[in-house]
């Protein structure tokens, strides 16, 4: 079932790529979805599928570009607010990623090192005749949506996502610590996104996972 969904999505996106109006820059595709929806696995399968089309692919994972802990924890705001509004430098990702992808053949981006809690800056080259896949949560927030040519939303039931993340994210501590973190921070941030942005309505393609 998953393979067929990936194949169909690749065909749809390749059609968007071949028929794009501006061929002087990459086609920017967002792979959106809430925590545990399967975004990372899906984008890996999708990039493999694009090899059948002999198409150049660039990939960015939003979680590679979060800010340091002191900018998103114990800030005085509620935890859900820190997650939604402070986890990423919203304007910085426009300046350093989304706008440059529309104008030039490289981006200079901050990469986050989780173990060291440090940021390092790297240049990433991008071919103008390519598809760029950007994977992450909250991609359709009002500040970013304009820059994407096409957005796919992976829609996965809460129960499935909940079980995945609570058994996956051992770095948060034991099971009760994970449940507390998701209840107070991540799921409330996701609820805010679903209610204010309505990504299911804004997406170009919805895939049920």
Regions found by a protein language model. Give the residues of each.
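Extreme N-terminal, non-catalytic leader segments
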Residues: 1-29
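Short beta-strand-centered segment that lines the nucleotide-binding/catalytic pocket of NTP-utilizing
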Residues: 53-70
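ATP-dependent NMP and nucleoside kinases share a basic, alpha-helical "lid"
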Residues: 118-169
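Small-molecule kinase domains that catalyze NTP-dependent phosphoryl transfer to phosphate-bearing small molecules
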Residues: 141, 171-209
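Conserved lysine of the Walker
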Residues: 39
């Amino acid at each position: 079932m998953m393979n067929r969904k990936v194949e169909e999505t690749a065909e749809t996106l390749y059609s968007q790529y071949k028929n794009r109006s501006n061929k002087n820059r990459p086609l920017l595709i967002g792979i959106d979805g809430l925590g545990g929806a399967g975004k990372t696995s899906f984008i890996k399968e999708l990039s493999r599928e694009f090899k059948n089309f002999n198409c150049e692919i660039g990939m960015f994972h939003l979680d590679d570009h979060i800010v340091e802990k002191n900018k998103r924890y114990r800030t005085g705001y509620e935890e859900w607010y820190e997650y939604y509004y402070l986890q990423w430098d919203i304007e910085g990702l426009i300046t350093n990623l989304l706008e440059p992808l529309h104008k030039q053949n490289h981006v200079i981006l901050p990469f986050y090192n989780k173990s060291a809690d440090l940021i390092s800056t790297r240049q990433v080259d991008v071919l103008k005749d390519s598809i760029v896949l950007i994977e992450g949560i909250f991609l359709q927030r009002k500040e970013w949506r304009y820059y994407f040519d096409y957005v796919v939303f992976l829609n996965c039931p809460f129960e499935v996502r909940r079980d995945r993340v609570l058994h996956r994210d051992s770095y948060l501590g034991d099971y009760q610590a994970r449940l507390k973190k998701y209840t107070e921070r991540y799921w409330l941030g996701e609820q805010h996104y679903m209610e204010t942005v309505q990504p299911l309505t804004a997406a170009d393609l919805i895939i049920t996972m």
